[in-house]
Amino acid sequence: MRRGQNGVALITVLLVVAVVTIVCAGLIIRQQLAIRSSANQLHVRQAWHYALGGERLAEAVLRRDLRQGGENTREPVDHLGEAWARPMTPFKLDDGGELRVRIEDPSGRFNLNGLVRKRKVKPDSVKQFRRLLATLGMKEEIVQGLPDRLADWLDADQNPQGEQGAEDNQYLLEAPAYRAANRSFKDVSELRLLKLSEADYRRLLPFVSALPEDAPLNVNTASVPVLAAMFEIDPGQAENIVDARGREGFQSKDDFTKHLTQLGSKTGNVSYAVGTRYFQVISEVSLGDRRQVLVSTLQRGKDGKIRVMARDMGQGGLPIPSTGGDDWKKDER
């Protein structure tokens, strides 16, 4: 009888030890997960503040650029030879990470919101966008269909443009269903909603922007495809413009107009300038095993005040934009 009791006691002790071991192991695992989670949260917060630091640095560079160019200049000039447009040296961080900052001019791209004026479609702008797609070598169905779908996305009505336009009745058939925005783009990523593949979206991305509809094109930073599309000239003539402006750019709208006239073309109804009010700052932070990208859209006033129009933490980094010459042909299909 006593042997049986001893056996039960031994089993009970072993069971208790096993339970305690399992509980302790669970506590240790939970503690490790909590520590790892805290470290990740710390890295996220650190990366966010480092990225904001990159944005502040860009603001300082842009203010200095305006001072050097003269705040009272009637026609401010912004070109690719200025300090803001040059690659910045990566900044080493105390935690072993790295901060990279790049400033771009979205006014040198085709403004998608420019297809409408007061929510009404501008046929000339639709044609310009179609020429851009053709110049980039996009598929014919995209060249013909995307401009109409974009116009429908931006305008106020529910009447499809052309044969390949799309309004709510088409998008409600998608899975999941959605509606046309009938407003301006807040971000160029909305193009993905217009039945555009990821590969085609990436191909188009360096050449388009989503600025206020009245934002003029900066001819000093525009690429060959954009210049060709906007001013209805062939790519060879657009390359001639890029060569003529050089690194210092055109110093006035008249300079650009004269050169365009020499090529046998006119500015037409294109709204253009030799400077810009808008800048895009890409702050990329590498910290530990994390990589964080902050894309900030800034507006710089003539008085040097800078306003943050938008911040986007959801980007995986933006491609280096095409700035002219033959580099835009590399991915041409």
UniProtKB/Swiss-Prot annotation:
Q: List the transmembrane segments.
A: 8-29
The primary location reported for this protein is membrane
Q: Name one Pfam family in it.
A: T2SSK_1st
Keywords for the protein's UniProt record, in alphabetical order: Cell inner membrane, Cell membrane, Membrane, Protein transport, Transmembrane, Transmembrane helix, Transport
Which cystines does this chain contain? none
Q: Tell me where on the tree of life, at the top rank, the source sits.
A: Bacteria
> What is the protein name stated in its UniProt record?
Type II secretion system protein K
Q: Where is this region: Disordered?
A: 313-333
Q: Which family does it belong to?
A: Belongs to the GSP K family.
Residue positions assigned to the propeptide: 1-7
Q: How is it modified after translation?
A: Cleaved by prepilin peptidase.
PANTHER family referenced in this protein's UniProt entry, alphabetically: TYPE II SECRETION SYSTEM PROTEIN K, TYPE II SECRETION SYSTEM PROTEIN K-RELATED
Topological domains on the Periplasmic side lie at 30-333
Q: Where's it found, cell-wise?
A: Cell inner membrane
Protein purpose: Component of the type II secretion system required for the energy-dependent secretion of extracellular factors such as proteases and toxins from the periplasm. Plays a role in pseudopilus assembly and seems to control its length. Interacts with the pseudopilus tip complex that is critical for the recognition and binding of secretion substrates. Type II pseudopilus confers increased bacterial adhesive capabilities.
Cellular component, GO annotation: plasma membrane; type II protein secretion system complex
State the oligomer form and interacting partners.
Type II secretion is composed of four main components: the outer membrane complex, the inner membrane complex, the cytoplasmic secretion ATPase and the periplasm-spanning pseudopilus. Interacts with the tip of the type II pseudopilus subunits XcpV, XcpU and XcpW. Interacts with core component XcpT.
Record GO biological process: protein secretion by the type II secretion system
